[in-house]
């Protein structure tokens, strides 16, 4: 059920307090116990593959935690999740998206009959999205006979003028649709093997699917068959594989 406007703002204020407290405590703990805090963050990063990512050392990203940029990004993500309109078994939001040629369309346009449609939300500056991109491509190779796939390029997770990581791709926050389309074109160098579209500048699909910084879904016949947990800590293409294998068996 859609939150009434006063209720939404009350929830936003509560989230603001939670995030501010989290960042303040994180700063204090990082100052007093830097080694322990880094160990805890590295332990969490095992879920994302960041600890195994050859393009990043922990010094490229752990020092950015609890910064002002970290605060604003986490707050944006947490606020966005208040607008989550999805649940397994529920109707999938038919949000507008834009093809790389600039044509406006909708998510449901990519559904074909009763075939499952796998949605992969992410951006080039999201290390876990890129690190696991080959896993996603293998899903396409293995299940293209029974399912369709769609990549939805959303706002940058770690824009160079936002919560930036060292040694990451240099893409600034998108100021207009052309910026977003240019960023999405970089994915073509990775041969995605499925259509790539971008979210509108209102970020409607990202908000209604609570997709920032990255997330996986499986739709079927207009409904949500699988709702992956939000990334980066819980972005798992292997869970989509299990869903598709069950459908194929």
UniProtKB/Swiss-Prot annotation:
Gene Ontology MF term list: thyroxine 5'-deiodinase activity; thyroxine 5-deiodinase activity
Parts of the chain that traverse the membrane: 13-33
Domain of life from the UniProt record: Eukaryota
GO annotation, cellular component aspect: basolateral plasma membrane; endoplasmic reticulum membrane
Disulphide linkage map: none
Main location: membrane
Role played: Plays a crucial role in the metabolism of thyroid hormones (TH) and has specific roles in TH activation and inactivation by deiodination. Catalyzes the deiodination of L-thyroxine (T4) to 3,5,3'-triiodothyronine (T3) and 3,3',5'-triiodothyronine (rT3) to 3,3'-diiodothyronine (3,3'-T2) via outer-ring deiodination (ORD). Catalyzes the deiodination of T4 to rT3, T3 to 3,3'-T2, 3,5-diiodothyronine (3,5-T2) to 3-monoiodothyronine (3-T1) and 3,3'-T2 to 3-T1 via inner-ring deiodination (IRD). Catalyzes the deiodination of 3',5'-diiodothyronine (3',5'-T2) to 3'-monoiodothyronine (3'-T1) via ORD.
EC number in record: 1.21.99.3, 1.21.99.4
Parts of the chain on the Extracellular side: 1-12
Protein name (database record): Type I iodothyronine deiodinase
Active site annotation, chain numbering: 126
Pfam family, one: T4_deiodinase
GO biological process: amino acid metabolic process; hormone biosynthetic process; thyroid hormone catabolic process; thyroid hormone metabolic process
UniProt similarity note: Belongs to the iodothyronine deiodinase family.
């Amino acid at each position: 059920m859609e939150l009434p406007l006063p209720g939404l703002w009350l929830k936003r204020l509560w989230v603001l307090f939670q995030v501010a407290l989290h960042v303040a405590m994180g700063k204090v703990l990082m100052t007093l116990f830097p080694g322990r805090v880094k160990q805890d963050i590295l332990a969490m990063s095992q879920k994302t593959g960041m600890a195994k990512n050859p393009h990043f050392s922990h010094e490229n990203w752990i020092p950015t935690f609890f910064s002002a940029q970290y605060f604003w990004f986490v707050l944006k993500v947490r606020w966005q999740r208040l607008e989550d309109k999805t649940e397994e078994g529920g109707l999938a939001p038919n949000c507008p998206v834009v093809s790389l040629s600039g044509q406006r369309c909708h998510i449901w346009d990519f559904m074909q009959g009763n075939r499952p449609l796998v949605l992969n939300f992410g951006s080039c500056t999201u290390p876990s999205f890129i690190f696991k991109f080959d896993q996603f491509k293998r899903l396409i190779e293995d299940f293209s006979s029974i399912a369709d796939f769609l990549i939805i390029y959303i706002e940058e997770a770690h824009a160079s003028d936002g919560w930036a990581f060292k040694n990451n791709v240099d893409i600034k926050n998108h100021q207009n649709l052309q910026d977003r389309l240019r960023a999405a074109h970089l994915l073509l160098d990775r041969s995605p093997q499925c259509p790539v579209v971008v979210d509108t500048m209102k970020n409607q699909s990202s908000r209604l699917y609570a997709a920032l910084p990255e997330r996986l879904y499986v739709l079927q016949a207009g409904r949500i068959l699988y709702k992956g947990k939000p990334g980066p800590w819980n972005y798992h293409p292997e869970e989509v594989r299990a869903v598709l294998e069950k459908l194929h068996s």
